[in-house]
């Protein structure tokens, strides 16, 4: 038997062998019987448009542009009229077969060129299918197309007796088809292997199928030479089978309950997992924002610390200059000498101008000392403030660095793994 190529059939006739039509094919004996009865013209439930290749061939030729599942009747009528006219002209004219050289010599789109094209189309028109159908009917008298063509032409060529004879033959062929389909479907369902033989003669096929079934039964009887089963044993087997069936039903219901429970648990776990992912994502975003803020604050603090260090250096330079100037002033000033400051010294007493000069000098010295002392205290206070501020900034910088290290460590620990 030749292997059925479904892909080749799908390419040859995509509408007949489409995936949407698979459900229409009969797979069981009852469906096949109903399908065969619907194909019988004498049956009251005859299908007016059976699913055959000729029927779908019309769909391929005259498919409607608006709806591909319907036939464009206007297009089909026009095409059939054109085929009729071509066939009529072909029968009335001489059978001329133009050659390629004759066609190339003609002027394209001229009257002779169009006439030559019509002759070529007439020679390859599809109305010759009727003659081919007649030849196939003579070769395969048991085919469905032969029976239908015979029934269609019976009213014109035969009398009523011949029609009844054809009807009886159709009934006999229908019975043979029914028996054949019953044998094939049951043998497939029960695992009985029927030896392949040519399917041209259905009677031989049925005989071979019956012989295969009998041989299978005989071999089974030989292999299983067990004593006959008593009624009690049959009852026990039936009870065991019913118990097994109940156990299977119980196990099936348990599996359904377990499946439902696991499905709900999976949905709940998935919802919690999604919530955890959202929470971790939100926490990660907040920590990233805090880290950015800490980085910005750290950069500002470092900048301010650098400015304060520059100011501290300038203040130290000014303080050093002030200390050096004060030391030089104490070493070179006459007001600081003991002779000048000692009121009992002879020079201060005996000098005619010593009274007014020493008084003014002492006043200037005291005022200068006051100014110098206030300036020194001011700079010392500013210097101490700058030192305290610097110490405070250094402590904040250390705290920020520790916080940054802890934040990066926490991010590395809390970073969730990538999920699908």
UniProtKB/Swiss-Prot annotation:
Ranges of compositional bias, category Polar residues: 132-153, 325-339
Ranges for region Disordered: 132-169, 323-363
Modification Phosphoserine occurs at: 230
Effect caused by changing residue 117 to T: In strain: CLIB 630
Superkingdom in the source lineage: Eukaryota
Effect the entry attributes to changing residue 325 to N: In strain: CLIB 219
Biased composition (Low complexity): 343-362
GO biological process, one term: cell morphogenesis involved in conjugation with cellular fusion
Keyword hit for Phosphoprotein: yes
Effect of residue 157 to T: In strain: CLIB 219
Outcome reported for the amino acid change (mutating residue 249 to K): In strain: CLIB 556
Keyword tags: Phosphoprotein
Variant or mutagenesis effect after changing residue 90 to R: In strain: CLIB 219
One cellular component (GO) term of this entry: cellular bud tip
Consequence of substituting residue 409 to M: In strain: CLIB 410, CLIB 413 and Sigma 1278B
Biased composition (Basic and acidic residues): 157-169
GO MF annotation terms: myosin V binding
Leftover remarks: Present with 7820 molecules/cell in log phase SD medium.
Function, as annotated: Localized to sites of polarized growth and is required for efficient mating and bipolar budding.
Protein name: Protein PEA2
Origin species: Saccharomyces cerevisiae (strain ATCC 204508 / S288c) (Baker's yeast)
